[in-house]
Amino acid sequence: MRRKLSTPTAKTSRRLRTGAKKDYPLDQIRRHLETGPIVLVSSAWKGKTNIMTMGWHMMMEFTPALFGCYIWSGNHSFKMIRKAKECVINIPTIDLVNEVVGIGNSSGEKLDKFQKFGLTPVAAEKVEAPLIAECYANFECQLAEARMISRYGLFIWEVVKAHVATSPKNPQTLHYRGQGEFRVAGRTINLRKKFKPQNL
């Protein structure tokens, strides 16, 4: 049975502490992903949805916006995402740290993680996988390259739609350090004047 998806509203969730989201330029998504935050990957296949926690990912190209990530073949999300050939990369902030850990500790094979962790699925514009309303940013992805999936578990995605909250300006994203420790971001240091233009 297909899960009913919500439409984003001001009352979407008690944990939604970001500003309203707006469309975001695809060639600028690197500003949110190149810093290496923990992400939540949402997927959908044959009426079922799932979420997984991920820390291994990288920007690969800016235009078009290509994004690579590793998914272990034994993960339930691996099977769903490989079949669907699409997903949503969602960026949580410190408000969702317990959900990030809980999602990473559980399998979606027999569990509805949206329901279990009180997260709100919102219909995406270009993919079937839902956005996670409580996350600061959501990037809709379609599979761009599949040749390295079987051997390395490496998926290469094209981001086809991006949604980023208008506030806070400096979100407190999570960065995993191993051994159960996270570093929390939030402060931005602007050294643009010191960069060569081609290196920006």
Question: What are these language model-derived features?
Answer:
Residues 2-200:
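Basic, polyanion-binding surface patches
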